[in-house]
Regions:
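Non-catalytic C-terminal accessory/binding modules of secreted extracellular proteins
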Residues: 41-199
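Residue-level detector of conserved, well-ordered beta-strand and adjacent loop positions
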Residues: 16, 82, 204
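Residue-level detector of functionally pivotal "anchor" positions at catalytic/ligand-binding pockets or at interdomain
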Residues: 198-206
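The catalytic-center signature of Zn2+-dependent metalloproteases
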Residues: 1-37
């Protein structure tokens, strides 16, 4: 069915099921995309290969709060990388790590609330690290444990996201995004990775 093909943000976004977290008494916190639309944060768009660190939203550091990887063939299509750590609005039962969102902004879809109506070209979707888009376990029961597998490196220790990995940074416009990330790590609540240059893997950055 179409419902089986469409992958909504589910509990990851307050614009979807996230508003019902804890029966609506503690809805999920705003995503990096939502926070950027509110003007609360600025999405960092790297211009050169290098080593990048992402801090959680509630930590005051010089690191960016979220990273944007734009499709050069279509500036309105991009990936957003953010650091999800347990806090007031992000429950520990959903895990911790880097959440990846694929945005394909088409004005009319946002205007008429049809963002994800087309299963072949969804406008707002989570890229699950375990490549499993279902919140249901092997027994067919809904489980918040399934959400932990969405995060990088997460429960499956997924340390890369490129045009060729599974999941991958596929794009609707053009052939490839061409902006791979390697050596994704999480240490003391900080997400780090090497952007575009695999030769940086293993180098100790301070």
């Amino acid at each position: 069915s179409v419902a089986d093909l469409i992958q909504s943000p589910d509990y990851w976004s307050v614009m979807d099921y996230g508003q019902y977290m804890y029966d609506g008494y503690a809805p999920i916190g705003y995503s990096a995309y939502e926070r950027s639309l509110m003007g609360w944060i600025k999405l960092y768009e790297p211009q050169e290969p290098g080593y990048i660190s992402i801090s959680p939203f509630d930590k005051a550091t010089n690191n960016p709060k979220a990273v944007l990887l734009r499709n050069d063939e279509n500036p309105a299509e991009y990936y957003i990388l953010e650091n999800r750590q347990p806090s007031t609005w992000f429950p520990s039962l959903m895990g911790n790590g880097m959440l990846v969102t694929h945005i394909d902004y088409v004005t009319s879809k946002w205007q008429y609330n049809t963002v994800n109506n087309d299963p072949n070209r969804q406008g707002y979707q989570i890229v699950p690290a375990d490549n499993n888009k279902s919140p249901y376990n092997d027994e067919g029961k809904f489980s918040f444990e399934c959400f932990k597998g969405d995060l990088f490196p997460g429960t499956y220790n997924m340390t890369e996201l490129t045009d060729d990995t599974s999941p991958s940074t596929n794009v609707y416009a053009g052939n490839k995004l061409g902006k791979p990330i390697y050596d994704i790590k999480e240490e003391e609540g900080i997400i780090t990775f090497c952007y575009k240059d695999p030769s940086l893997v293993g180098i100790n950055f301070v």
